[in-house]
Each structure stands twice: as structure tokens, then as C-alpha cells.
Amino acid sequence: MEQVLFVNACVRGEKSRTLKLARRFLEVYQAEHPQHVITECDLCRERFQPQYPEILAERDALWSAGQLDHPMFAPARQFAAAGRIVIAAPFWDLNYPAILKIYLERISVADITFGYNEKGEMVGLCRAKDMVFITTRGGAYREAGLDWMEMGARHLEALCSMYGIGRFQCLAVEGLDDVRRDQAAMMQAGLSQAELLAKEL
């Protein structure tokens, strides 16, 4: 039975355009794979704390003592055990909301999500075959040749390499804040893309 982890970083909740895309993707995915179990990690509910000095000190002490089964590392264990990862986050300030970065710092734990071999080379320890990143952007960065300014998907794709996740796919609907465009039609096209991607996995 495949475990699918859905990381919800859509700060605006059900009003979020990104979340609408993610919900449609997951709905179709579940219909295509009824035997798979989808677990949602809502970062707005979880309220993970940033790595303040006292939190980092506790984490370092637990890790040094080999207590990787401690509740502090539960998010990392959940992430590492999932067979598929779906992350939904809007495009904010050229990447994504801070709550997602805080989560990524929480799950990036040596000997859980990644490690090192005898040569000192980094090796991924996650089970996931692929990661799907779903996002919406107000501007049309790809169309304008400004892909280099986009740091969210690029960062997550790099982390896939670190975690040992073999395939990264990004579903991004762009230009949604451009009043010259038909935003409703663009969202509808994005929902269709989400359905197609869900059926292809």
C-alpha cells in the first residue's frame, strides 16, 4: 500500500489558487490509485518553529545521542517513509512561503532523509520515487525569459537529489495576477493539467 504525503503550504487556505490545483490533482490521483493512502501535513496547522538557538541545541543533542525516534524527528521520518511526495505552495518573493522553508529544515536530518557513505559522499535515504510540486505565480516568468529568478521549484528539485528522490515534476500556472489575461481560463487550463499529471503518475 503506497503512502502519499501531501505537504500543504498554502497559507491562504481554501481561498488559495494553488490549493485548488492541488485538491484537483489529489482527487484524480486518488481515483486512479484507490489503494494508495494520502496523508496531509498542513503546515499552517502544524506551526513548526524555526530553528531558533534553543530548538537547534535540542535537536543537535538528540541527534548526537542517537535518539532519532524522538518526536522532534517525526516529520523527517514521515517524509522519508512516503512513497510519493506532493508539495503545494504559492510563489512568494521568488520562491515560496517561509512555513515551507521551516518544514524543509525540520525534515533535513542526517541518517533519516539523507546520509553519507564511506567516501563522504551524500546519499539520499528517502523512499519516494518522485516529488510533485504544485504552484501558482502572479507573473509569467517562463514566458518572459525570467526562469532564473524562480528559486522555489529549483530549490526543491535540488533537495530531491539530496534526499534520493529520483524524479521531480512541477505544475506551475503563471500570469494569474496579470489583469490583461483571462485568469479564469488560465486556472481552468491549470486544473486540466493537474488532472492529466495525476493520471500519468
What spans do the regions from the language model cover?
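Short, glycine-/small-residue-rich phosphate/pyrophosphate-handling segment
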Residues: 116-162
